[in-house]
Design a protein with these regions (language model features):
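Short, acidic Gly/Pro/Ser/Thr-rich loop/turn segments
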Residues: 31-34, 87, 144-145
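Short glycine/threonine-rich loop-to-helix capping motif typified by GTGT followed
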Residues: 37-39, 66-76, 147-152
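Glycine-rich, small-residue loops and helix-cap segments
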Residues: 1-2, 6, 84, 107-169
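Short helix-loop capping/hinge segments that flank enzyme active sites or metal/cofactor-binding pockets
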Residues: 18-23, 27, 69-127
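A short helix-breaking turn/cap at a secondary-structure junction
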Residues: 1-40
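Acyltransferase
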Residues: 35-59, 82-88, 112, 116-133
C-alpha cells in the first residue's frame, strides 16, 4: 500500500520508524566465493545484525542456467546494436566488445528465443518469493571497482536479478 503524507508531517512520521518489519531473502550463490574479504565480512555482519529481517536460503537450482542465458541475450543484443560500428570500426572496439559481438553473431534464433523464454519461466517460478519477502539482498559486486578505465569489475552478482527483472538491494 502507498501512504502519502504532507511535507509538514513527513519528518515526524519518519521518526516513528517503519510501518512494518521488512523481510528480505539472501542467497550465497556460487559467485559468493568471488567476494573480497572485507565485503564478505561486512555483508555477514549486516545479515547477522538484522537476522530477524533476513532469511538465508539455498540458491534455486535454475539460477545456474541464468548466467548462460543472460550471456546469450547480452551478446546477441550487442551484436545487433553495434553491427554497423563493428563492420566499419572493429579495431576501435575493445577486445571484450569484439569477442562478445563475434559470439553474439553466432547464436541461433532458437538459442536467443530459448534464453528469452527462460526469463518468463524463471520469473514465474520465482515470483512467489515476493508473497513473503519485500526484496532480495545481494552484493552489487565482489568489492571495490578495479583502478583505471579498463574494467568496472564483474556483474556476476547482479546478472540473476537483471535477467529476472526483480528488485534487489
Amino acid at each position: 500500500a502507498t501512504i502519502h503524507y504532507s511535507t509538514e508531517n513527513i519528518l515526524s512520521e519518519t521518526k516513528k520508524g517503519p510501518l512494518f518489519d521488512p523481510k528480505f531473502i539472501f542467497y550465497k550463490t556460487e559467485h559468493w566465493k568471488l567476494i573480497d574479504k572485507k565485503s564478505r565480512e561486512s555483508f555477514e555482519y549486516f545479515i547477522k545484525s538484522f537476522k530477524k529481517n533476513i532469511e538465508i536460503f539455498d540458491t534455486p537450482s535454475y539460477f545456474k542456467d541464468i548466467h548462460k542465458y543472460h550471456q546469450i541475450i547480452h551478446e546477441t543484443d550487442l551484436a545487433n546494436n553495434f553491427s554497423v560500428y563493428f563492420k566499419k570500426f572493429k579495431k576501435k572496439l575493445s577486445k571484450y566488445m569484439q569477442d562478445a559481438i563475434t559470439r553474439g553473431n553466432k547464436y541461433s534464433a532458437k538459442e536467443y528465443a530459448e534464453a528469452i523464454d527462460f526469463i518468463k519461466r524463471s520469473y514465474e517460478s520465482y515470483q512467489e518469493v515476493f508473497e513473503d519477502y519485500h526484496g532480495v539482498l545481494s552484493p552489487a559486486s565482489p568489492g571495490v571497482a578495479p583502478t583505471g578505465l579498463k574494467s568496472t569489475g564483474t556483474a556476476e552478482f547482479n546478472k540473476v536479478w537483471s535477467y529476472l527483472g526483480t528488485p534487489c538491494i
